[in-house]
Structures are given as structure tokens and as C-alpha cells.
Amino acid sequence: MRRNPHFSLLKPQYLFSEISKKLAQFRKENPEISVIDLSIGDTTQPLCRSITQAIKEFCVSQEKQETYRGYGPETGLEKLRTKIASEVYENRISPEEIFISDGAKPDIFRLFSFFGSEKTLGLQDPVYPAYRDIAHITGIRDIIPLACRKETGFIPELPNQQSLDILCLCYPNNPTGTVLTFQQLQALVNYANQHGTVLIFDAAYSAFVSDPSLPKSIFEIPEAKYCAIEINSFSKSLGFTGMRLAWNVIPKELTYDNNEPMINDWKRLFATTFNGASLLMQEAGYYGLDLFPTPPAISLYLTNAQKLKKSLETAGFSVHGGDHAPYLWVELPEGISDEEAFDFFLHQYHIAVTPGHGFGSCGQGFVRFSALTQPQNIALACDRLCTASLKETMVLA
């Protein structure tokens, strides 16, 4: 059998796997050094008691014949979809438009497969690498990188001459940590509606938005129901990175060019390829929604980000993001190349970060810091960053 040619388009190693490998090698060679890993955006705070209690109760219920449950509905438990519609969307979205899934990555894969390979896809640059890799794996015909530069507030530069079938956006953004205003989001929705573009909006970090003057969901823009699909997840908001529970929204008003609703085909795809998310996790998510709009861990991570940002700026770095997201997008000091970025922070500060060029060509000249760690790690990182100014560190380097 011939190899699927799409896999030849992928880099030999996934970005974060490569970082883990380099970090493991450094620790092996330097066992006496304590490295603070601020590279990978995994959660660290334990689950809230209300969630673990719901998990325990559901597990016990499965021991009894009268309460045992087999398959659930492919689109998710009605009570969970209803609660998401109410708590997250303030009933702007109906439960029938919400589909419970096992994660944002699988949703991206399903969506790209759903639309088919003969499409033109616009991706932010820098972008979370999974988008680009999944686009390659699913055989998307044309992938157009859309530059997101600091001069434009890390908002994508949209093409005027070339039409996009699909436009993927992530806000609060990974990796830049930036957010959109209502006016900025309205302009992107207007573009999508004017050009017949389907806008896939990744709102996985929406729980980090605490300012009511900023949008959390694309559906806070009324016209978005004609052009947008939203992805969201419990991974960062409730600490479900290892438990896997997410959802996506397909509005009834979203149609093909023949005016047929897309939601009908999406239901068919879900029923064919997915038996539904774990009932155990759905029960956990249902009770976890009681912690919204700002689950306790979110406040802790945002405090981490604020402390880290202050220390980085005090040390002399230029920092973006971190106010409504767990990520800080830090400009590399002059004289440090992209190839040296990881080693610079690892050797000078004993801090592991993610090199920006791994997110795309427009990530060159930056690194990403993650605040999704324990407060004591942030305190130690801040101490190391402030021990010497950036100018002094550059002399040492």
C-alpha cells in the first residue's frame, strides 16, 4: 500500500513533542538544575469538588441495573446542551444547534473533513499548529496563511483578491494571547458574510475574558449566525484537558450556496462517525457549568499571567497578551535568533518556552509563555527573570 501523500506535508515532529524531547535531554544532562516548564499549555489545578462528586455519583449509578446507561445521544445530553445554551450563550443559541464532542482537535478534524478537500482555507499566522497539520491530513487544497502582526494588533490581514471558503480564527488567541473588540469581530463577520466565507471561531479560551466590553462568543455579533461555526471546550475552563469534553455550534441559519442548512449534514456526519461523548464526562460538564462564567482556576491562571507579564516587562522584554488569556507573546531581544530562542531562555533563566516560529513564519522573533502552571512556579520564574535585567543577561549570553 502507498503512503497517504498528505502525511509528507507534515513536519517530522509535532511542535510540542519536539519541545518535550529537547527539555528531557537538557534535564538528563543537567539533573541539578530545576527547569520551570512554561512551554506547553496544560492545566495544573485540580478539579472542583462539585465535579468530582458528580463523577463519583455517576460511576456508582452504573453499578445498578435500574440506573445503568449505554449509548447516549450522538449530539450530547439534552440537559447539557440546554445548560450551555443558557449559561454560555444566554439563549442566543438553541440546544438543537449545540453538539457535544470529545475535544476541539477532533472537532477541527471533523469540520475540515465535513467541508471537503476542494476548499480554500485561511489560517492565522501565527497559528496553533494542529490547524495546519489537520488541514494537511484532510487534504485541504489551498491553505492561505494570513499574517497577524503586532502593528495590526495580531488581527489577520484578509485577502481582497482571493476568496476564502473557510476562515479559522481563535480568540482569545493562542499563541499571541490577544483578544478582539466587538468592532474588530464585527468587521470579520462582515467580511465572511460579504464573501460567502464560513468562519470557524475557536473560543476555547473565552472563559479568560473578564471584561464585559469584550466579546466571548462570535454569536454576540447577530449576523454571525449566517456565516459562523463556533468551537469551545471545557479543557482550560474546568481543567478537562485529560478528560476530553467540548462542544461546537452550527446555527440553523448557516446554509450552503443552494440555501440548504448545513446543520442537517452535520447531524448526519455526527451520527455516522461518533457515538457521542462520554456520558461520565457530560455529567461532569453539566455540574461544572455552575462554576461559570469564571471558574476558580481561571482567576488563578490570570493572576499568574499578570505577575509573569509584569516581571517580563520589568526585566526589559516587550510583552503582548496575557490580560484575557493564559498566554504571553514575548518579543525576542535583539541579537537572539529564532533558532536560539528556546536555548536562550532555557540556559539563561532555566525556563522552557515555546519558540514563536513553530506557530508560523509570522511567529519569528517571538516566544510564547504559558501561565497555566502552579503559582509557585510563576513566583520562581519571576524571581529568575528579575534577578538580572535583559541588558545584563545579554552580556552574560
UniProtKB/Swiss-Prot annotation:
The modification N6-(pyridoxal phosphate)lysine is found at K236. Pathway: Amino-acid biosynthesis; L-lysine biosynthesis via DAP pathway; LL-2,6-diaminopimelate from (S)-tetrahydrodipicolinate (aminotransferase route): step 1/1. Coiled coil: none annotated. Its EC number is 2.6.1.83. Its cofactor is pyridoxal 5'-phosphate. Pfam families: Aminotran_1_2 (PF00155). GO terms for biological process: lysine biosynthetic process via diaminopimelate, diaminopimelate-aminotransferase pathway. Pyridoxal 5'-phosphate binds at Y71, A104, K105, Y128, N174, Y205, S233, F234, S235, R244, N275. Keywords: Aminotransferase, Pyridoxal phosphate, Transferase. GO terms for molecular function: L,L-diaminopimelate aminotransferase activity; pyridoxal phosphate binding. InterPro entries: Aminotransferase_I/II_large, DapL/ALD1, NHTrfase_class1_PyrdxlP-BS, PyrdxlP-dep_Trfase, PyrdxlP-dep_Trfase_major, PyrdxlP-dep_Trfase_small. Homodimer. This is LL-diaminopimelate aminotransferase. The gene is dapL.
